[in-house]
Structures are given as C-alpha cells and as structure tokens.
Amino acid sequence: MEAKFAHIILFFLLAFSFETLMARKESDGPEVIKLLKEFESDSRCKGKQFWPELIGVPALYAKGIIEKENPSITNIPILLNGSPVTKDFRCDRVRLFVNILGDVVQIPRVT
C-alpha cells in the first residue's frame, strides 16, 4: 500500500514539474518576436493578434488580458496542451493551450 502511495506522489511531483517542449519564452530570442510581428502585419484581422507576454500566466488571467486588448475576440477556449483542434481560421478566436496547472504554454494567437 505504501509503495502505491509513493508512486502516486512521485507521479504528481513529476507531472507538476513538467514543462512542455512547445512552451515558448521571451528568452527564446528576438527571432521569435520578429517572426510574430512579420506575420501580424500580413494578417487580415483587426487588432492585436499575438500575446507572447502571456506565456506562463494563469489561463483565466490571460483570457481577461486578451479580451481587454482586442474586443473583437469573442471565443477564447482553454485547452490542455496537445488537444486536437480544427484547422479553420477565425478572426474572433484565440485558443489558450495550458499545462495541468492551468498556465499558458503556447503563445496565444488568433486562429
């Protein structure tokens, strides 16, 4: 019984300390920000399109920031990182991909 409990504790400790390879940080370099700005200038949607500064923040806080900075965004689903999504593009949607702690792990963008 104690061994099972120890395995469960170990699993949760590892799960909470796991950071996905998809997570991007500003420390990844200016090339990431540069690519985002280039894509943003070609966009057909109005308002801010990317929020790289929201990496690592809680999803509900990020959702509030996105709604405040671009009122045309009306659909902000919160999804576990790696969840399957459709490939259609909508100017009113930003998907927030989160880890098991609920922190944003991918750059939120209009999709």
From Swiss-Prot:
Tell me the keywords, alphabetical order.
Answer: Protease inhibitor, Secreted, Serine protease inhibitor, Signal
- What subcellular locations does the record give? Secreted
Protein name stated in the entry: Wound-induced proteinase inhibitor 1
Pfam families assigned to the protein according to its UniProt record, in alphabetical order: potato_inhibit (PF00280)
Please tell me the species this chain comes from. Solanum peruvianum
Q: Where is the signal peptide?
A: 1-23
Q: Which domain of life is it from?
A: Eukaryota
Q: What is its main location?
A: secreted
GO terms of biological process kind: response to wounding
Q: What does UniProt give as GO cellular component?
A: extracellular region
Q: What family name appears in the similarity comment?
A: Belongs to the protease inhibitor I13 (potato type I serine protease inhibitor) family.
Gene Ontology MF, one: serine-type endopeptidase inhibitor activity
Which segments are removed on maturation as propeptide?
24-36
Q: Where is this site: Reactive bond?
A: 87-88
**InterPro entries attached to this UniProt entry:** Prot_inh_pot1, Prot_inh_pot1_sf
